[in-house]
């Protein structure tokens, strides 16, 4: 019986490359000349620091552009609304979601069941296993997951025939 797993993962290497490219682009930008800033990456969290909150927002936009160039889906990005002001600098955290959260998994399973395609879906930790009799049914579910607006990017792996 064919099956596959729906997962939501961000490639840490590509993310690190995007952070490095962001740092390089900011070194060359005229509006960041003479400005004290930093871009740090640790444990799937990017910390952006700058002298003004406007520059922090610009840094988020630059990071988004670099993620797009590296084929990392920006839906996995979770930007803190609050910019923290500490003395001389402003800081903003950007977290990246790994795995499918429980409530998103339940919504996706409900979406799969409402589609009336003859497949079974079950939650397995931070992924969803989808099993069906026909490969075409599984491909229809893949398309459904890609087009769903659940605020998280989905990848498919472990395809068994």
UniProtKB/Swiss-Prot annotation:
Keyword Nucleotide-binding: yes
A Pfam family annotated for this UniProt entry: DUF520
An MF annotation (GO) of this entry: nucleotide binding
Superkingdom of the source species: Bacteria
Family that this chain belongs to: Belongs to the YajQ family.
Function: Nucleotide-binding protein.
Protein's UniProt name: Nucleotide-binding protein Sama_2557
Classification lineage: Bacteria, Pseudomonadati, Pseudomonadota, Gammaproteobacteria, Alteromonadales
